[in-house]
C-alpha cells in the first residue's frame, strides 16, 4: 500500500444502559499495526469495535481516520474499512462461489476468477463451492465470510472474534494473512480469546473500565 493510514481515538467512553463499560480510551494505530483487544465476556470489546466503525454511539470522545472524524467522512471511511462481526454477513441462499462473486462485485474488486478459486482452496471450501451457504456448517459459513479478507483492498480490518469455529490450522492461516496485511501497510484490529502468537502482535486489555497495553 502506497499510503500511510492512521486510526485514532480520543477520550472514548462507552455506556450501555446504566453500565459504564470503559472510559478515557486514547490510542493511535498506524499502518503496520496488528492489534488484539482482550478482556472477559461482556466487558465491552464488541462495543468498542462497533464504536470504532461508527455502528454504535460512544458516550464521549471521538474516532479519527487519517486525522478526520469518521462521522464527517463516512463514505471514505467505509471504503477503507473491512468489518467482520459475530454474524457472518453472507447470503444464505447463495453458494460459497456466488457469495464471493457478489462481494467481489460490490467491492469493485478487479481480481479474476482464478483468484476466487485460489481463495476457496485456501479456506478449505474447494469442492463445496456450489452448495448453498444455508446448507453448510457454521464453521464453513464462517470461512465464506473470512474469504473476503483475501479479496479485500481495504487498508483497515476490524474483526470481532475472527477465529470462532475455526480449527488450529485455520487460525495459523489467518494469523499469517493478518501479518501480511500489516507488513504491507494495513491495520488489523481484532478481538479473540485465542492465544495468538505473532512477533508483530500488540495486545490491549480492557479491565476495570480501562484499557492497558
From Swiss-Prot:
Pfam families (alphabetical): ABC_tran
GO cellular component terms, semicolon-separated: plasma membrane
Broad class of where this protein is predominantly found: membrane
Binding site for ATP: 39-46
Annotated GO biological process: cytochrome complex assembly
Membrane topology label: Peripheral membrane protein
Family annotation (PANTHER family): ABC TRANSPORTER I FAMILY MEMBER 1
Subunit structure: The complex is composed of two ATP-binding proteins (CcmA) and two transmembrane proteins (CcmB).
Family, as annotated: Belongs to the ABC transporter superfamily. CcmA exporter (TC 3.A.1.107) family.
Protein name: Cytochrome c biogenesis ATP-binding export protein CcmA
